[in-house]
Amino acid sequence: MFRLYRSIATVFVFLMFSVGAVTLGTVVNLIIELFVRNKDKKQQILRYLVKKSFQFIVRICSIFSVFKVKFRNIDLLEQKHGYVIISNHPTLADYLILYSRLNNSTTVMVADKLNRTFMRKIICNMGYVSNNVDAEKITTILSDSDNILIFPEGTRTRNSKYLKFHRGAVNFSIRNQMPIIPIFIKCSEPTFLSDKFFNWKAPETTPVFSISVGNVIDYRNLINTNDPTSIQIRKLNNYLEKLYNREIQSAEETVPPSQND
């Protein structure tokens, strides 16, 4: 019976998210475009509204047991500026949960396909960048105080037993001399929103997300900076893959009990 209740709650939350996304992407964005001319001001207003919307949805999901979230060291994200933030990407809910706790100076790298939807304009106004944009162009977009969030797998995790990273995140980190903040995400129900945008049928138990912010990684302490850049990138990427595979596997049996932080 409780599973049926959570399934109904999942449908409700999905509808609420969809209506909110359409409203923000069209009506709200249009109003802000009409009355706010300053580009930076427009960006900050939209980022604030999206963050607050996501915080509300995460709270509703917790109240109705759609999923629960356990954070560790998440407050560090709100205090950091000028970092490359990376994370594994096991489900479609990851971005929503993470963005609800990022500071407003964080730029997000989004899938290129989103730029071909009705969300294209609001994505542009929020200062987000496509994942097919080269590192040099991203550098011109970011200010010195900006963070950038990148999912180095390039898509959702397909094989949780061994994560494989693209080199875009480390390439950007090394070329712009920006330290890396790793985020490790583990979900107690691995199939929850892992391969579908929406699944009305709730898992037997309430999914619990364990989201942990790791220590800052300064690549200059890990690799020889006198090596050619391509070798530095390869070595740092290999290091991050090993780090994530070790951390994710060690978390297999340690997902915390259902609660929201």
Can you describe what each PLM-predicted range is?
Residues F54-Q55, T117-I122, S212-I217:
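Short, basic/glycine-rich phosphate-binding loops at helix/coil junctions
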Residues M1-G82:
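Membrane-anchoring hydrophobic helices of lipid-metabolizing enzymes
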Residues N29-K51, L77-N132:
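Catalytic core of membrane glycerolipid acyltransferases/transacylases, capturing the structured
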